Amino acid sequence: SPPVNSDRVQSDTGHYNTGQYNTGDFITGNFNRGHCNTGDCNTGDWNKSSFNTGCFNTVEQKIMLFNKPSDMTYREWIDSDARYLLNRIPKNVVEWIYSEDMTDEEKAEHPTHETTGGYLKVLDKSECGQLWWGSLSDRRKEIIKAIPNFDAEIFFQCTGVRVDE
């Protein structure tokens, strides 16, 4: 049995790790998967830099965007205006639906609409995303569309947001 590391947190798995949230052995840094990684947020083995997938890397890799190689590192992506905006997509949004705007199915599912005059509809992820997109200024929409390799169809598949609406 390996020695107990008092700096380890419960979410670590593996042996001889320093840092937090590591899976694997002989890791220094945080949020690593694999073995013998130094740095943060690596998947793979023996990496000396951060945000790598693969093995034996000493510099940060460029990331794939829209299924194609880009000239952007993950660190650059994290610091980008586009990521900041995408992280603002609301979740768990509700909308008041008046009785006169309800379908027969909604009325059957929400009989209290007769007393309250409607019901609160919980919007799904794509509806929330589309509302977010509609609220963006043209300048902010262009920030999203300027993501390297931007592809509207792939963006829709991943976010549920149609950029042409």
Locations of regions flagged by a protein language model:
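Short, glycine-biased loop/turn motifs at secondary-structure junctions and
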Residues: 1-165
